[in-house]
């Protein structure tokens, strides 16, 4: 349900963009994002930090896009957000010596340090690839292609990354289960 709520503003943006253009789509995205955050707060009593950050960026860049009637602001948002997420993951691992993914999920999952490090680097790489893809698609393809890729391409890539994460973690989770059963 939560993932569906997170996807609704994007689908609304895409639909309104195709039907009415950039300005109306940006306004729709901003309003839908604010409503989404309110609904998340009401239903789940908490909004994750990453959701707040995304919400703030969407509202800020969405307002700029609507005001100037220029899709480039939302294109920059995607690049900045992916770069920011990659930077946070890399800094957590190489500066603070503890992957942020481990800090977030370490209570739910018991994994060896090298697995946490690879997982963290894998997601950092994913965000860097998304950032670079966004730059290429933003500047070398039409706005229509970018809007379609933003809506469906990044969603598909995220799904593939999540599945790859599950496949990577599965053998390690099995080892943890076997260790717990032997104890």
UniProtKB/Swiss-Prot annotation:
Any one annotated GO CC term: plasma membrane
Alphabetical UniProt keywords: Cell inner membrane, Cell membrane, Membrane, Transmembrane, Transmembrane helix
Membrane-spanning ranges: 19-39, 53-73, 76-96, 121-141, 151-171
Membrane topology: Multi-pass membrane protein
Entry's localization field: Cell inner membrane
Keyword Methyltransferase: no
Signal peptide: none
The family this protein is said to belong to: Belongs to the YciB family.
Protein's job: Plays a role in cell envelope biogenesis, maintenance of cell envelope integrity and membrane homeostasis.
Protein name from the UniProt record: Inner membrane-spanning protein YciB
Organism from which the protein derives: Actinobacillus pleuropneumoniae serotype 3 (strain JL03)
